[in-house]
A protein has these predicted regions:
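Alpha-helical scaffolding within the catalytic cores
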Residues: 49, 76-85, 116-119, 177-180, ...
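N-terminal module-boundary/linker segments of secreted carbohydrate-active enzymes
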Residues: 23-101, 110-113, 363-389
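Substrate-binding cleft of extracellular glycoside hydrolase catalytic domains
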Residues: 103-228, 232, 236, 335
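Non-catalytic scaffold segments within catalytic domains of secreted glycoside hydrolases
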Residues: 219, 231, 242-258, 266, ...
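Aromatic-lined carbohydrate-recognition surfaces of secreted/lumenal glycan-active proteins
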Residues: 65-67, 197-199, 223-254, 298-311, ...
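Substrate-binding cleft of secreted/luminal carbohydrate-active enzymes
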Residues: 58-69, 299-389
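Aromatic- and acid-rich polysaccharide-binding/catalytic face
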Residues: 96-98, 256-279
Length: 389
């Protein structure tokens, strides 16, 4: 543990933000009571507690996360207790990101060992007190292609046509997702809450649910259909539903409302921000997402970021920590480090042993407003002065 108590930290950070950064930490009344509303009124107590802590932590700093961090790393795969993050700084990330698409679509029986490993890592993350978030690069249920198959603009329409073959297929996939949600339990026997990011990066054109394949009405109805089916039909009550547009260039508050499903259908405001090392863009978008968070009373976070194959020695303090300091953002999650035991490729987005940014990563780790696993409060016990309905 490297941290000072959260209460003292909140007081110290109250003066971090510049006077024109209205989304930054408040100078007074930080503990003012607030009431938040989840899209699921029947959410589990642990899910409500996590939601309250996602809100509370924004005024204190940001959680560091890494996709697939516990499942594999640059030179290892499936090692129990493994983590590129921990191998560098001695601590696990605060947020564990994973993708469960292969568990639910046509690939669901293709690699049972990998699927068992992924779910084991989810349980280990929860047992350590980490926060879990999941995207789904789900296959195209109309064409049979992958999530990048944007050859048809009929996919969403067919999903929404009750009784169609695509509708039945998509429901089968959601049934499998619901089974995972119902059986994802920690060693305490409780259901594990997950920040669920369906249809991520919907602002882009690469996916079958993206901007070139769906109308605004179709996307909004697809989002609502998915939430209602999981929540109301299948009884999934441990999901926090997160929208995550891709924001690689400078954006405004209005850009975050692109195809917004409605306040009652979104719990968490995310953004996938692959801005490279352009701090001006990152800061602009962090300010915008923070303002959306405050306006909607919904926690927010950077749900994906990173620079593929980066070599900068000061990346973490200069391009991650500095822009995030003083912002009301709960987390920043870097994309994966592909398992590459020969280290012949450059598909990595975070630190690992031997990377030139190791020392700089440790510097970021030691900052009082960067939170890793051992720094977290009990994220599954309600935060003070935050009520969740």
């Amino acid at each position: 543990m490297k941290r000072i108590p959260f209460v003292l930290l909140a007081l110290l950070l109250s003066g971090v933000a510049c006077s024109d950064d209205s989304e930054g930490p408040k100078k007074e009344g930080e503990s003012d009571p607030v009431t938040l509303t989840l899209s699921d009124p029947n959410a589990t107590e642990e899910t409500k507690a996590l939601y309250s802590n996602l809100w509370a932590i924004q005024s204190k700093g940001f959680m560091f996360g890494h996709h697939d961090d516990l499942m594999y790393g640059r030179t290892w795969y499936g090692t129990e207790g493994g983590s590129d993050t921990k191998a560098v700084c001695g601590d696990y990330p605060a947020v564990y990101s994973f993708d469960c698409a292969e568990h639910i679509d046509a690939r669901h029986a293709s690699d049972p060992d990998a699927q068992a490993l992924r779910l084991r890592c989810c349980r280990e993350a929860y047992d350590r007190g980490m926060v879990l978030t999941s995207c789904i690069h789900i296959n195209n249920p109309l064409t049979g292609g992958d999530s990048w198959d944007n050859s048809s603009n009929r996919v969403a329409a067919e999903i929404l046509t009750e009784g169609s073959a695509t509708n039945r297929t998509f429901k089968e996939w959601l049934d499998r997702l619901a089974d995972i949600a119902h059986n994802l339990r920690g060693s305490d026997g409780k259901l594990i809450p997950v920040i669920f990011r369906p249809f991520h990066e919907h602002t882009q054109t690469w996916s079958w649910w993206g901007a070139s394949c769906t109308t605004t009405e179709e996307f909004v109805n697809l989002w609502k259909f998915t939430v209602k089916y999981l929540r109301d039909t299948k009884g999934v009550h441990n999901f926090i539903y997160a929208i995550s547009p891709q924001m690689d260039s400078a954006k405004t508050v209005d850009d975050f409302y692109f195809r917004w499903p409605g306040d009652e259908w979104v719990d968490f405001v995310g953004m996938d921000c692959y801005q490279g090392i352009n701090n001006a863009v990152f800061v602009t978008n962090l300010k915008a997402i923070s303002k959306v968070s405050l306006a909607k009373l919904k926690p927010c976070g950077v749900t994906e970021t990173g620079v593929e194959g980066f070599t900068a020695t000061d990346y973490w303090t200069t391009n991650i920590h500095a822009p995030l300091t003083g912002r009301r953002v709960s987390m920043v999650v870097t994309w994966r480090n592909k398992y590459d035991p020969m280290e012949s490729g450059t598909h990595y987005f975070s630190v690992f042993p031997g990377h030139p940014s190791e020392r700089d990563f440790v510097k970021m780790y030691n900052q009082e407003n960067s939170f890793f696993c051992s720094d977290l409060p009990d994220m599954y016990t309600p935060a003070e002065n935050v009520t969740v309905l």
